[in-house]
């Protein structure tokens, strides 16, 4: 069995399970919403994790909006892990299977970036990452061999505790693969209420699939934080997922 880091799904949601914070109702006490949302970050920092994980959509929405065009370049032929700048205590692992993010920095919030790619990227994109100082590794041909990626993070980057920050689709894929060991759910006292908005876990599958099957939640702790924020901690018990 491959050695993998412990994965804690650390999520900030409204009471109706939505993830888009700029759609939530405002705090009851008149406080600035960003101040209330900082409870989530304070809890995150308290974990002292080796890394946190985001998917490409979240990264391009919040940090690096430009896209790299791999289509006009030469396909990569070697797929070895590259170690770039490693001077931060914590890293940000970004799952970007097609190598689409055009980075303008090697860090987010002071955390070194590690890109998880598929083997369909261009040689020019890999050179771009190296020039920027960004580490990268490969998660199989299509970039979706998450077990391989997590093993590399454990074995080559010495990561033992990693926080999965989302978004909803990446959370859903990790849940389906039973990679999540704990759920840390920070609930903001607000509502979105619109159907179709990204929620905590979103697995894009068929009606006959049960992505959470074989997994049970045990409440480990709950805490009322400031400004009405609730923090719930669950252990996820797993069995073989054979209910496809």
Residue ranges and their predicted role:
Residues 1-244:
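Enzymes that bind and transform nitrogen-containing heteroaromatic metabolites
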